[in-house]
Amino acid sequence: MKTKCLILAVALTVIFCISSGRRVKAGNPPTSASSPAGTATVRGEVKFVGIAPKPTPINMAADPSCAKQHSTPALNEDVVADAKGALQNVVVFVADGLGDRTFDPPTQPAVIEQKGCVYQPHVLALQANQRLEVVNDDPTSHSVHATPVSNREWNKAEPPGTRVDEAFAREEVAIPVKCNVHPWMRSYVAVFKHPYFVVTGTDGSFDLRNLPPGTYTIEAWHEKLGTATQKTTVGANETKAIHFVFKPTSGS
């Protein structure tokens, strides 16, 4: 009888250990860029107050192969706002509040295309060590030249139909990217150590999702109009709305 009880006790112990092991394996994965664990959201709009400057046409006469790709002149994108003031090409991001959390970069690359001798998109944001592909869809050659302050500078010739594959290791807002062949070509790349960033589109809106609950400094960056910051506290499963307003500057 004692022998049977001992065998039963050992068997129950083994079953419990196996079951416990399975529960551990089914736990939540580590927080990463591909699977942020938070449930909070900060959203809002970026507005331009005042009379927005009219986009000026780009003079592409220096390279006829560029100009002939446009039925109407391409326009500068340094300040783009609609009639209601919705401001495009603003990088909105968490500037402070994430503590020592770490995030893996996405496996998919961020892409800039060169079409009609214009960088598309004009402003791009990605994570540190995420691959950046710069694709040349033009029939003419380009020279892609990134001029960062905190990262490694690079300058690469790019014949038609080729691509440049690079990455930035450090956080930096924002890195100018130009073409040494076509001086009107300019783009900006913002680099972050976390996935909580967005570039505003035509409606000027932003949506920072999957944030851990906490108090954050949210910053908005624009290439001509400068920066603005706001602090907000958001709880689990909560959505907070904030808004940024930019005004004309002497250089805009």
Predicted features and spans:
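Bacterial N-terminal signal peptides
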Residues: 9-17
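Extracytoplasmic copper-binding redox domains, predominantly the cupredoxin/blue-copper superfamily
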Residues: 21-252
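Bacterial N-terminal signal peptides that target proteins for export
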Residues: 1-8
